[in-house]
């Protein structure tokens, strides 16, 4: 595992990997990454990017199930602490129970559920605070787990689309379109989201 910053050479290596287009976009716009190579090819990466320190991990399919994700994340957490970064944020699909459990064991807090659009369905926003500032932010963001808070988040997220790349290291033009109507017409607390998933597993 190694921490790297984005260079032209790294961009080329990432583009030659088999990462999903969405994850690749995040990596290319990140502040720094932790990567794992095999035979000089990148087989796993974990990125941090944007004002909100957006964080995500992807491992090439044939190398999944080997514990690489946790090792990459541990490397990122160590680097964040060295750089005095206050928190990491991420988004999970509720159906990805293994990833949710892994991240909550590390210290990630589940903040709220947002209904993105008909195709993407609902997503869970999470945060990993490192210090008092991060913990304060986590408490503040829990407001979005309320009905009125969820509505306000949907409004803010809709208005922030032109600035998304700077906020979460992802170009809004490449994102699936956020459906404001769908978001405000659906709501459930994050605890209910997890409970619903458990019923079907």
Each predicted region: which residue ranges?
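Short amphipathic alpha-helix that is part of the acyltransferase structural core
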Residues: 1-26, 139-143, 150, 154, ...
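Conserved beta-hairpin
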Residues: 30-44, 201
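Short hydrophobic/aromatic beta-strand or adjacent loop that forms the aromatic wall/cage
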Residues: 30-31, 121-127
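Conserved acetyl-CoA binding element of GNAT-fold acetyltransferases
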Residues: 49-61, 91
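Conserved acetyl-CoA-binding loop-helix of GNAT-fold acetyltransferases
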Residues: 59, 65-78, 105
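Conserved GNAT acetyl-CoA-binding A-motif
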Residues: 80-94
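Conserved beta-strand-loop-alpha-helix junction that forms the acyl-donor binding cleft
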Residues: 90-100, 118
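Conserved acetyl-CoA-binding loop of GNAT-fold acetyltransferases
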Residues: 104-114
């Amino acid at each position: 595992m190694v921490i790297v910053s984005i260079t032209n050479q790294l961009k080329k290596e990432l583009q030659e990997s088999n990462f999903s287009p969405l994850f690749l976009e995040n990596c290319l716009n990140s502040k720094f990454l932790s990567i794992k190579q095999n035979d000089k090819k990148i087989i796993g990466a974990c990125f941090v990017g944007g004002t909100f320190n957006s964080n995500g991990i992807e491992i090439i399919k044939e190398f999944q199930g080997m514990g690489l994700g946790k090792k990459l994340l541990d490397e990122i957490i160590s680097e964040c602490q060295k750089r005095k970064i206050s928190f990491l944020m991420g988004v999970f699909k509720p159906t990805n129970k293994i990833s949710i459990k892994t991240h909550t064991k590390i210290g990630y807090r589940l903040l709220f559920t947002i209904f993105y659009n008909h195709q993407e369905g609902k997503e869970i926003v999470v945060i990993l605070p490192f210090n008092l500032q991060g913990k304060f932010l986590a408490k503040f963001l829990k407001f979005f787990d309320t009905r009125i808070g969820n509505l306000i988040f949907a409004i803010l997220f809709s208005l922030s689309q032109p600035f998304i790349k700077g906020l979460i290291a992802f170009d809004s033009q490449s994102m699936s379109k956020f459906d404001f109507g769908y978001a405000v017409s659906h709501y459930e607390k994050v605890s209910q989201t997890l409970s619903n998933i458990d019923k079907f597993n």
